[in-house]
Amino acid sequence: MVDLVKRFLQLEAASGIILFFTAVLALILANSPWSEIYFSFLDIPVQFRVGSLDVHKPLLLWINDGLMAIFFLLVGMEIKREALEGSLSSMRQAGLPVIAAIGGMIVPAAMFSFIINDAPQFMAGWAIPMATDIAFALGVLSLLSGRVPLSLKVFLLALAIIDDLGAIMVIALFYTAELHTIPLLFAVALSAMLLMLNRSRVMLLTPYLIVGALLWLAVLKSGVHATIAGVILGFAIPHIRGATHTPLRQLEHQLHPWSSYFILPFFAFANAGLSFSGLSWTDLGSGLPLAIIVGLFIGKPLGVMLVSWLAVKAKLAALPENVGWQQLFGLSVLCGIGFTMSIFIGGLAFGTASEAFASSRLGILFGSLIAAVFGYILLRNATRTCQRKEQKRVSSQL
C-alpha cells in the first residue's frame, strides 16, 4: 500500500510540473500574435451524431464536459479506494484530513461571499476558492524532494480527495442547469443498472464502461453537469479490500497516466489562456479577482489551520506522524492552489464565454501563484527548522 501511495505521489508531482508549463504556454499564446489561432482552435465545432441523438459543441466544451468526466471517473475510484483501504478507511486516519478539508471549503467560500456581497452578479462564483489542485500542490511539494515526511504528502492527498468530493457535491447541487425529465430518468435507470452490476459481482470492466458511456450522454442531456456521470461510474467499479488485482485497480492504473499527462494538462491549456488585453494591475485589487485571491490565499489556509488546531486541542484528531504545526501551516497555504478545479468551477458558474469567467481566471491564476510561492517558502523554512531541531536532539544524546 505504501508503494502504491509513493507511485501515485510521484505521478501527481510530475503532472503538476507539466500543468505549470501548459498553463504558461496557454497564457503566452493568448497574449501573442498567434492568439487568434489559439482561440479559433478551442472554438472548432465537434459533432457526435447517432440517429436522432445529436451532440454538437465547440472543442472547449468537449474538453470540459467529456475529458473532465474521465478525470472525475478517476476521482470517484480514488475516493472509493481510499475509503475502503487507504487514508480515509478509518476515523483515526481520516479524522484530521476530513475536518481540515471541511474548514478549507467553508472559510474561503464565506470570505468570497463577504467581499463580493455588493456585486450579486458575481455571487455564483462562491465555490471557486474552495478547490485544491492536487497535481499542482504535489508538484510544488516535490521541489522539496525527500525533506518533507511522507505522512505530510499523504495528508495533502487525503485532504484533496475530500476537497474533490465536496466539489462534486457542490457541482451536483448548485451548478445544475434546467433539468430535463426524460434524460434524467434514463440517467437514474442507468445508475441503478451500474449498482446492479456491482451487487451482482460482475468483474468485467466492459459492461460498466458501456453503461457509463450511455450514462454520460443521459446526464449531459438532463441538465446535470456531465462530469457527475464519471463520479457515479467510479463509485460503481468493483473493488475488494486487500486484493491486488481488481477492476478498480486495473482501470485506475490504466487511466492515471492519461489523466496526469494528457487530460489535466490539455484542460489547463484550453482554460488558462487568459488575454490580458484591456486588463490592468488595479483589476486584481477589486471585485471578483480580489475575492478569489483572498479566498484562496487567506481563506483556504485559515480554514484548514483553524479547524485543525481546534480538532487537535479537543483531542478529536492528531497531527500526522513527524509533522509539526509549522509544516502543516505551509501545507495549508499550498492548499490555496486552486488552478484547474477552480477554473472548472468558474466555467460552470459564469459560462466559459463570459467576461466574469475571464475576470475569475485572473484571480485564480494570481491567487494560485501566490499560494504556491508562499507555501513553498513556508514549507522549506519549516523543514529546515525541523532538521536543525533533530540535529540538536541527536547531538545532545551523544
Curated annotation (Swiss-Prot):
GO biological process terms held by the UniProt record: regulation of pH
Statement: the UniProt record of this protein carries the keyword Transmembrane helix: yes
Database matches in InterPro entries: Na/H_antiporter_dom_sf, NhaA
Membrane topology field: Multi-pass membrane protein
Keyword terms, alphabetized: Antiport, Cell inner membrane, Cell membrane, Ion transport, Membrane, Sodium, Sodium transport, Transmembrane, Transmembrane helix, Transport
Signal peptide per UniProt: none
Catalyzed reactions per annotation: Na(+)(in) + 2 H(+)(out) = Na(+)(out) + 2 H(+)(in)
Family membership: Belongs to the NhaA Na(+)/H(+) (TC 2.A.33) antiporter family.
Purpose of the protein: Na(+)/H(+) antiporter that extrudes sodium in exchange for external protons.
Protein name (database record): Na(+)/H(+) antiporter NhaA
Gene coding for it: nhaA
